[in-house]
Amino acid sequence: VVISGLAAGIDRVAHEAAMAAGGRTIAVIGTSLDRAYPKDHAALQARIAEDHLVVSPFAAGTPMSAWHFPKRNRLMAHLAQATVLIEAGATSGTRHQVSACAALGRQVFAPVHLLEQLDWLQSAKVRPHLQAWRTHEEAVQLVLEALPIERTASHS
């Protein structure tokens, strides 16, 4: 199961790739279920809601707020066995997810170049839970070795 935030960029790609591979996906959104953000993800959100799962910690009609996205990221840390970083910036909301993973004792997989760029990945509480990778192939191998993932030919 791929759990991601339905944001533009890698989140969208993660959801679409999971579905294309016949897997399952969970979208944890930073808005209430009656809203889509970004708006051009409304059809994807509806498709995930129909065939997979969309989760929100916010009641219907809740106005959008910037603090919703760190809350969404912390919720993803609680739902997932591990977090795989692909991209993040110095002020990225992903740091909230990584911090929550560390507090929960969950693993974080991150590319070496992010470790070299981001101070928040070097914190003493995050470091013991962090595994670095250089290539996407190495990331896949690390995840497969670290997590109890059942591989099947098809999903029902």
Describe the function of each predicted region.
Residues 1-156:
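Glycine-biased, small-residue-rich flexible motifs in mid-sequence functional cores and linkers
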